[in-house]
Swiss-Prot record:
Residues 2-26 form the Carrier domain. It comes from Erythrobacter longus. GO terms for biological process: fatty acid biosynthetic process. Keywords: Cytoplasm, Fatty acid biosynthesis, Fatty acid metabolism, Lipid biosynthesis, Lipid metabolism, Phosphopantetheine. Belongs to the acyl carrier protein (ACP) family. This is Acyl carrier protein. It comes from the Bacteria. Its main location: cytoplasm.
């Protein structure tokens, strides 16, 4: 996963309060 996607994932996790493994785009 690209660095940008990682940053987006982190933001989504912080805003939605979901687990990171549910947001992975692999």
């Amino acid at each position: 996963m690209s660095d940008t996607a990682t940053r987006v994932q982190k933001i989504v996790v912080e805003h939605l309060g979901v687990e990171s493994d549910k947001v992975t785009q692999e």
